[in-house]
Regions:
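Short, surface-exposed, charged amphipathic helix/loop patches that serve as local interaction elements
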Residues: 1-25, 43-112
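Short aromatic-centered micro-motifs
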Residues: 30
Length: 112
């Protein structure tokens, strides 16, 4: 999902035009490169992160994420964007600070 009307997600949850939590399942609206997008830490996203970071289990993933490389950040951002509904997210051009904020927002929403 990129751009478009963010007044409704199609899943019964209101979407925030400024970013922030937008759904009961932990979705978060973020702005990446001036485009509103949705991130969500799903079970599938966690599995993708484990695979992409070549770690086994959540504890190992959490430890690895304490010091992410740029490649690692791309893996994690793409996973949470797919969790938010995107099928082929293009993340290579996203600024690192925006990427880190989006990833943090997805994890924070999942922890609530």
């Amino acid at each position: 999902m990129s751009g478009g009307d963010w007044s409704h997600s199609g899943r019964g949850a209101a979407l925030s035009p400024q970013g922030g939590e937008i759904g009961a399942r932990g979705e978060v609206g973020v702005v990446l490169g001036g485009v509103r997008r949705r991130v969500c830490l799903t079970l599938g996203a966690l599995a993708e992160i484990e695979t992409g970071l070549a770690v086994e289990g959540l504890a190992a993933a959490a430890e690895r994420m304490k010091a992410l490389s740029a490649r690692d950040l791309i893996v994690v951002l793409a996973a949470v964007l797919r969790g938010g509904g995107e099928t082929a997210p293009d993340v290579a051009g996203v600024e690192p600070r925006e990427a880190a904020r989006a990833v943090a927002a997805a994890f924070e929403a999942a922890a609530r």
